[in-house]
From Swiss-Prot:
InterPro entries: TOPRIM_dom, TOPRIM_RNase_M5-like, UPF0292. It holds the Pfam family Toprim. This is UPF0292 protein MTH_890. SMART domains: TOPRIM. Binds two Mg(2+) per subunit. CDD domains: TOPRIM_RNase_M5_like. The keyword Magnesium applies. Its cofactor is Mg(2+). The lineage of its organism: Archaea, Methanobacteriati, Methanobacteriota, Methanomada group, Methanobacteria. Mg(2+) 2 binds at residues 74, 76.
Amino acid sequence: MSLIKLQQITDELEELKYQGEQGIPILIEGRKDEEALRELGVNGPFIKVSGTRLSLSEIALRASRTSRVIILTDFDRKGSELAKRLYRDMQSLGADPDLRIRRRLMGMTRRYIKDIQSLPSYIERLKLEVCPYPLDNI
């Protein structure tokens, strides 16, 4: 089970990496989320929602300058509310906000983590479940 979940999460992260490489902005909540995603190899253009002087409407306006935007807020109640609001605001501005990666990651990790910054440690835990012994000695 852990191997399948690990592969599914890896597939989603590969998709996120690809989208970022294509220049599609990724809306995240804050600095720690960006650090976690960079640790996982995602280097796309990030737009942070928290820790900025901009209002959500201004962030939505800035993000909607591109036709497509990925929303990847945390999986808790606050993150879900932010995702809904940003989705509505950007859609009304003519952008194509994408919640698919967030929904799939949330579905796979819901019982285990509640935020993006916890993804690297969760993935490491899954790797240990799949292969608990170091392979250096073989």
